Amino acid sequence: MDSSTAPLSIITKLALFERTCDSSYSPLAENLKYLVQFVYLLPAAMLHARILYILLWKHRNLYLKQSFYILFIMSCIACFTLVVQDIFFARVFQYMTQFCEPMSEFVENYPIFPAIYYPLQQHLHCAQPIIQILLTVNRMSCVVIPWKHSQVWKSFMKYAIALVILTPFLFIWNIIISKKLPVYTFGGFYIGYERVVIWATMTLFMLILRAITIVITAVCTFITVLRLTRMSKRLVSSERTLCIASFLISSCFLGTAAAESLFAFQVVRTSTSISYFLLPISWDILNVGTPIVMVMASSQLRRHVFGILKRSRSNSRVEDGTIVTGF
């Protein structure tokens, strides 16, 4: 099918008001928007990198024994990659309006770049809800079946990793086979796609995935809280940190789900639509908030990340392979 007559995705049709860059936006104002976001995205990327170094290398013998932290590593990798993409590509395309034309020409003339960049971005967005499900189920199983929690997750972990890597392809296959192109908004552009299979919309797929995740998260969280109220104080103390961290990460995730729902159900969009602003901000809250939540929740991880050498025996210890951390 000729590209000029190929059916565009609904989002692309609604967003593609002009096939060229909009020069009416002030480059200075748009550049300042990038600078504001750069101020919090760069420290977030550095924090993610530091956490991954701690978990995967410096203290791997401690953290890799814990199924929760293995799942959290996958979350960190996804968030870190998305933040780096935003710093160097997505936000540059959107807010460096003075370079909009040469950058959009690069995207069109070198299709290998969007063919890698956009599917990877969407793969990671799909992987995040799956990781969220696994994190909440992990915490629930820890309080429901504490006597065999470690053994169950040790056996299941290889399947969990495969699930996170492979399941997103069930949602992004249409993106992979479709043509990627610049979609012009706010004086810049983002990368969209022309759907080869009309009914297979990424918005619909993500909405279904987010809805499933919210239901599972709500059920698992309710069971976890109910079970924690019936456990002994010693066990509650040992599990409280990771459970609270999981709850807070779930809150960040729910904000993203709400923003994506607004974007999906908003029938009429304009170039000044608030949904185009809320969606990336909600992603930022999730990607930036996740490492902050874990560092704030776990005093042990906080000491390791920031290199604080002083150690409190009553506040941090290892018992039977379980990391026990206080606030």
Swiss-Prot record:
The membrane topology noted for this protein in its Swiss-Prot or TrEMBL record is:
Multi-pass membrane protein
One matching Pfam family, short form?
Answer: Srg
A GO molecular function assigned to this protein is: transmembrane signaling receptor activity
Q: Where are the transmembrane segments?
A: 35-55, 70-90, 157-177, 181-203, 244-264, 277-297
* CC per GO annotation: membrane
What is one process in the GO biological process aspect for this record? sensory perception of chemical stimulus
Major localization class: membrane
Where it sits in the cell: the answer is: Membrane
User: In which family does this protein belong, per the annotation?
Assistant: Belongs to the nematode receptor-like protein srg family.
What is the protein name stated in its UniProt record?
Serpentine receptor class gamma-2
What does UniProt list as this organism's lineage?
Answer: Eukaryota, Metazoa, Ecdysozoa, Nematoda, Chromadorea
